[in-house]
Amino acid sequence: MQQTNPAAVGDYLRKLQQEIVAAVEAADGGTCVRDAWQKEPGEALQGSGLTCILEGGALFERAGCGFSQVRGPRLPPSATQNRPELAGAPFEAMGVSLVFHPRNPYVPIVHMNVRMLAALPEGKDPVCWFGGGMDLTPCYGFEDDAVHFHTVCRDALAPFGDDKYPRFKTWCDEYFFLKHRNEQRGIGGIFFDDFAEGGFDNGFALLRSVGNAFLPAYLPIIERRRAMPWGERERAFQLYRRGRYVEFNLVWDRGTHFGLQSGGRTESILLSMPPLASWAYQQQPEPGSPEAALYSDFIVRRDWL
């Protein structure tokens, strides 16, 4: 049986966070606030983390990238839906999670997460599994952006088998779906959870490949769109679409539920929230408009490659 090495995963995740935060600061010109935190003695979870956030920047209205490494006495229900035999076991969880909300409505929202969860059943070997992925949520869709993003995702997974991209792409489409709206959240990407195929070494290698692919997937899209002019109409639609992001994260997202159920740090869990969002009753885009094209051509399940 392969040895598990959670410490190596933690080292990698800290380094990944540093690289991404440096890239955010370089692209925006601003400086992230770095908030190192430690859980208080006696709390349900013990551990620490680093939250990095840039607010009010030239490029990013809000860009948060958090690392956390925590231990808890019992796995919460959201983590054992597929592994009932581990219900109630102590656990260790670590990960990097980010959401970037750009100021320009033509630059898409992006989300990325890579994580490891280790169940620590008494008297037994640790059981480790990995999860994560990345997905893109444009307010205004561009075919070449979608193709680029999905190409980088596919290439990151190629060393692990030809089945991984189509499988994780479908998983992403199914996961980032607003059931109450019957609507995709964005143009998708890749998503995986409870991944333990090939043992610890293979799972960790896949995690690294996905994490390392994030900047090549997103930075070229920023550069293509950041200088596009926009006005009140685009801003209003951006805020309306951000409302969908809020709905998904609070109603459907397992990561949000896991964090809140397990006594996680609320400020870090809600790092994904946009600074501003809006709702309008039964808003319908004008036929033939770029806003209408988002619904008909982009936030639908389709093969981009």
Curated annotation (Swiss-Prot):
Residues at which substrate binds: S97, N113, V114, R115, G263, G264, R265
Subcellular location: Cytoplasm
Pfam families, per the entry: Coprogen_oxidas (PF01218)
Catalytic activity as recorded in UniProt: coproporphyrinogen III + O2 + 2 H(+) = protoporphyrinogen IX + 2 CO2 + 2 H2O
Cofactor(s) required for function per UniProt: a divalent metal cation
Top-level enzyme category: oxidoreductase
Pathway membership, UniProt: Porphyrin-containing compound metabolism; protoporphyrin-IX biosynthesis; protoporphyrinogen-IX from coproporphyrinogen-III (O2 route): step 1/1
Listed SUPFAM superfamilies: Coproporphyrinogen III oxidase
Binding annotation for a divalent metal cation: H101, H111, H150, H180
GO terms classed as biological process: protoporphyrinogen IX biosynthetic process
E.C. code: 1.3.3.3
Region (Important for dimerization): 245-280
Cellular component terms per the entry's GO annotation: cytoplasm
Gene Ontology MF term list: coproporphyrinogen oxidase activity; metal ion binding; protein homodimerization activity
Sites marked Important for dimerization: H180
Chief subcellular location: cytoplasm
Complex formation: Homodimer.
Entry function: Involved in the heme biosynthesis. Catalyzes the aerobic oxidative decarboxylation of propionate groups of rings A and B of coproporphyrinogen-III to yield the vinyl groups in protoporphyrinogen-IX.
Protein name (record): Oxygen-dependent coproporphyrinogen-III oxidase
